[in-house]
Design a protein with these regions (language model features):
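C-terminal intramolecular chaperone/autoprocessing and neck/assembly modules of extracellular spikes
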Residues: 1-74, 88-98
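Active-site phosphate/pyrophosphate-handling residues
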Residues: 26, 80-83
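Alpha-helical coiled-coil heptad-register detector
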Residues: 77-80, 87
Length: 98
């Protein structure tokens, strides 16, 4: 598959019930990146996450098929990573002040 730029609608005009993301950095960092081969032989040395494992940590990042984890919404994962980076920067700034 080839794709250009992926753009997801994100204007406040389309949103309601907005609240802060409640995700811990430890939970985000517990996601385990892996290298794998596809069972159908179509691709080797793919990198990614296991949907069933991510579902236990952040179900909103997982696409379900017939109620079972099937895929990961990788574009939304970036929001979680930004949250973790901000958390880590806050900790780093605090340590620098010591």
């Amino acid at each position: 598959m080839t794709a250009g730029t992926v753009v997801e609608t994100s204007s406040i005009a389309y949103k309601e019930n907005i609240r802060s993301l409640d995700a811990t950095t430890d939970a985000i960092l517990s996601m385990d990146p892996v290298i794998y081969d596809r069972k159908d032989g179509s691709q080797k040395n793919e990198v990614g996450l296991i949907a069933e494992e991510v579902y236990k940590i952040a179900p909103e990042l997982v696409h379900l098929k017939d109620g079972n984890p099937e895929g990961i919404k990788y574009t939304k994962l970036a929001v979680y990573l930004l949250h973790a980076i901000k958390d880590l920067k806050k900790d780093l700034d605090m340590l620098k002040k010591r």
